[in-house]
Design a protein with these regions (language model features):
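Short structural boundary motif marking the start of a folded domain
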Residues: 1-4, 88
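Negatively charged
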Residues: 66-450
Length: 450
């Protein structure tokens, strides 16, 4: 429990509670005008701020003259060594940000060379900044970004650092020492007005395990810094990294990225709708990947996908919407030898691939564990023929709805009368719109709502 005494105009109040409740109580007791709008609390740091080890001693001053900026000056002492040292004040800031009122706490302390402070101590409890606070969270305060991290060398997490920032000016980020950082998810999330990024090609990524959503929805970027030489050997999560970078016309050569440790690869190129080609990703080692769903989802301009025939997907469980909406793609790469024995979902895999006339020979796929075939070839209206899929094992299939919906050019399908339907719960509109497919080719048990 936190034990803190507040002295406001001679009136002393003791609060015992956890750190979040402590700050809420400050506002409820002394800042009543905004108490209903409090959402959360974050710590911000400047310059060479690393990790703090502090004791909250007393509130020295409180001012509520301006509801946009309420100052609570707090006196701190450094308990990391025997020489006590006063810290700069911490200021409590209230500011409406995109109709999401927040309470923010800004702390500032310039540390000496070789000084390392571990965490914050509120009397009675110790909290690790790296676990309990987003040390580098970032919001606009007026026209200023309250963050300057040059020289920081002990931060391990910069998740959502510039999350939806409207005003971005950090040209010196290429200097950052990132060797100790392990997580970089959503760093530039939602910077939709940003047309160019500073050069981050030399960032040390050797200890990073998570770069999911790194450029998420940077929808104005036409190109990226050269990230081809990033050390990605420890990356576990690569999901959403280029999610909805809809103006991106070319990617750096990421063909040599080491993805031996990567498990999560869903949505990598999701709605990169301006990309016409991809780097040669054929040699990516994805044998540890468990999810590659939506990887090329909505790549409307993509005319060709590199040879991915030798990808080892034996651990993948989800292939849903893999090529969804690749409307400019005339040929699906050869995926006939893929081991899909652990795959549970093929939902929408080729959905809206409106230009393909055939698919690779996937007749020998082991589909025993697949429970969802729905929308698999949905709206592939140029598709003329299919491989012999009569031997597919559908014992565990639960959903086949819309599987061949609107395959209006399809003239032949192998006899699938032996497909098991014992566990199927939904199979409506399976062949709806297949106007050129002779009705007698479709077994009665799949004839629903033709």
């Amino acid at each position: 429990m936190i034990e803190t005494i507040f002295d406001l105009n001679g009136e002393k109040t003791m609060i015992e509670n956890n750190k979040e409740e402590l700050m809420r109580n400050i506002c409820e007791k002394f800042i009543k005008k905004i108490s209903k709008n409090i959402d959360d609390f974050d710590f911000f740091y400047e310059e060479k701020i690393i990790d703090f080890k502090l004791k909250l001693e007393e509130i020295l001053n409180l001012s509520d003259k301006n509801t946009n900026k309420i100052l609570i000056t707090v006196k701190y002492k450094n308990n990391s060594n025997t020489n006590e040292e006063e810290f700069d004040s911490i200021t409590l800031i209230y500011k409406k940000i995109k109709d999401e009122p927040k309470i923010k706490i800004f702390g500032k302390k310039f540390v000496k060379n070789n000084e390392k402070i571990c965490n914050i101590i509120f009397k009675g409890d110790t909290y690790s900044l790296q676990e309990d606070f987003n040390m580098v969270d970032n919001y606009n305060i007026g026209d200023e970004i309250i963050i300057k991290l040059s020289g920081i060398n002990s931060i391990t997490n910069i998740d959502e650092m510039f999350f939806r920032t409207e005003f971005f000016s950090s040209p010196d980020i290429y200097k950052w020492n990132t060797k100790n950082i392990t997580s970089m998810s959503n760093v530039f999330y939602g910077l939709s007005i940003l047309s160019k990024l500073p050069d981050i090609s030399n960032w040390d990524m050797s200890n990073v395990t998570n770069i999911s959503g790194f450029f998420y929805e940077c929808s104005s970027l036409k190109s990226l810094p050269d990230i081809s030489k990033w050390n990605t050997q420890n990356i576990i999560d690569l999901s959403d990294i280029f999610w909805r970078c809809s103006s991106l016309e070319i990617l750096p050569d990421i063909s040599k990225w080491n993805l031996d440790s990567t498990k999560y690869m869903r949505n990598i190129f999701y709605e990169c709708s301006s990309l016409k080609s991809l780097p040669n990703i054929s040699k990516w080692s994805i044998n540890n990947a468990t999810n590659i769903c939506n990887m090329f989802y909505g790549c409307l301009s993509l005319e060709k996908i590199p040879d991915i025939s030798k990808w080892d997907i034996s651990n993948v469980i989800d292939l849903s919407y893999l090529f969804w909406g690749c409307i400019s793609l005339h040929e699906i790469p050869d995926i006939s030898q893929w081991n899909i024995s652990n795959v549970k979902s093929l939902r929408g895999m080729f959905c809206n691939c409106i230009s393909i006339t055939s698919v690779p020979d996937i007749s020998n796929w082991n589909t025993y564990n697949v429970n969802n075939f729905s929308n698999m070839f949905y709206n592939c209206y140029s598709l003329i023929t299919l491989p012999d899929i009569s031997k597919w094992n559908t014992w565990n299939a639960m959903n086949m709805g819309f599987m061949f919906y609107n395959c209006s050019s399809l003239t032949f399908i192998a006899d699938i009368s032996n497909w098991s339907t014992g566990n199927i719960r939904f199979k409506k509109f399976m062949f709806k719109g297949c106007v050129n497919l002779l009705k007698q080719r479709i077994p009665n048990k799949f004839n629903d709502d033709l």
